[in-house]
Design a protein with these regions (language model features):
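Short, charged low-complexity intrinsically disordered segments located at boundaries
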Residues: 1, 92, 159-160
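Amphipathic, interaction-prone secondary-structure segments
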Residues: 63-99
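Compositionally biased amphipathic helical and low-complexity segments enriched in hydrophobic
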Residues: 5, 36, 75, 80, ...
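Short, flexible coil/linker segments at or flanking structured domains
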Residues: 32, 82-84, 117, 124
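Hydrophobic stripe of amphipathic alpha-helices that form coiled-coil interfaces
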Residues: 58-61, 65-76, 136, 143-146, ...
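Negatively charged, low-complexity tracts enriched in Asp/Glu with abundant Ser/Thr
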Residues: 3-78
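Amphipathic alpha-helical coiled-coil segments
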Residues: 44, 48-58, 122, 129-143, ...
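Intrinsically disordered, low-complexity regulatory segments enriched in Ser/Thr/Pro
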Residues: 93-132
Length: 160
């Protein structure tokens, strides 16, 4: 057992040193905000409204990404990016389509990348675009899932 004086000096030195380095006090205050439970329906409604604004921004981002890719990199190919989603989905995802708008799916990208007449630079650019598409789709899916869950929670609160 450490004597009380030594224990206080040791703990005090460690705590003071930690709080001075890297602004831990500010970080701890920030992190505590994430750990607080929602206090009520009003906070859920505010969060839902923020997420719906994010969904509108993501919808426009999908349109912009598709337009830029289709008018630039993919212009001379038979491959397009298309914003897609079921009716009522807040944020649309980006899907691969053929330029005739008859087929959709990842298999179109795989078929395009397996062609021998595609330059290595073009292949790498399309792969980079696919990475951007995947990241965007993950963001859109998170927004959609969160809005759906908040809607269910609000409905449960109404029925309680």
């Amino acid at each position: 057992m450490i004597p009380l004086e030594s224990q206080q000096e040791h703990e005090g030195g460690r705590v003071n040193g930690a709080s001075k380095s890297y602004g831990n006090d500010a970080f701890n205050s920030y992190a505590k905000g994430f750990l607080k439970p929602f206090k009520g329906k009003g906070e859920l409604i505010r969060l839902r409204d923020e997420l719906e604004e994010s969904a509108r921004a993501a919808r426009q981002e999908a349109i912009d990404m598709a337009s830029q890719a289709n008018g630039g990199l993919l212009k001379s190919t038979d491959l397009w990016l298309t914003p897609w989603g079921k009716s009522g989905v807040p944020a649309r995802t980006l899907q691969w389509r053929d330029n005739r708008q008859k087929s959709m799916g990842l298999w179109l990208l795989e078929a395009f990348l397996s062609r021998d007449d595609i330059s290595e630079a073009m292949r790498q650019s399309v792969i980079d675009l696919e990475v951007q598409r995947c990241v965007f789709n993950a963001k859109a899916a998170t927004i959609n899932w969160s809005i759906k869950r908040i809607g269910k929670a609000l409905a449960d609160i109404e029925h309680a």
